[in-house]
A protein has these predicted regions:
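Feature captures the catalytic ectodomains and active-site-proximal regions of enzymes
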Residues: 1-154
């Protein structure tokens, strides 16, 4: 993966944009695996290139979401490329190729929000709250056995 850190990110983005513009779908979920897969190689330059590619692709999606008055949620299930090295007891730099336990971002890009809701994460907020949050943004109530949404509607 470090030999082609862009992977298929642009192709995924192009296909997603085409589907979004088709008007056939209300919801889509995609995975840019670049940071994860390239992070496992321990190649810092490749990881930087991978994440620059993802940044570029996410910006394209944001632009289309704004054009279509949509909502974009950006998150991850774990870190990897965020910590590429650790140090030995002697100070030697050692590649770190495993997942990290670092907190991951959770961003809702909603240019049309109009103060319809507030972000009110519970103290134990985590990945298990994203399904109900997504359902709420789509206009549905989450099942009672789901963890609570991260949103409170006004």
């Amino acid at each position: 993966f470090d030999e082609a850190p862009a992977m298929k990110a642009q192709e995924i983005t192009d296909a997603t944009i085409a589907l979004l513009r088709s008007g056939e779908y209300r919801y889509g979920r995609i995975n840019f695996a670049n940071g994860d897969m390239v992070g496992h190689t321990g190649n810092l330059d490749a990881a930087i290139s991978a994440m620059e590619t993802v940044d570029h692709c996410v910006q394209q999606l944001i632009d289309v979401i704004q054009e279509l008055d949509g909502v974009l949620i950006y998150t991850s299930d774990h870190g990897n490329a965020d910590q590429m090295f650790t140090e030995s007891e002697t100070g030697e730099r050692i590649p770190m190729t495993s997942h990290t336990l670092a907190p991951v971002p959770f961003v809702i890009h909603d240019p049309q929000n109009n103060e319809m809701y507030d972000l009110v994460p519970p103290d134990d907020a985590g990945l298990s709250h994203i399904a109900s949050t997504t359902m709420n943004l789509l206009g549905y109530e989450a099942p009672h056995d789901y963890n609570q949404s991260l949103l409170r509607f006004n």
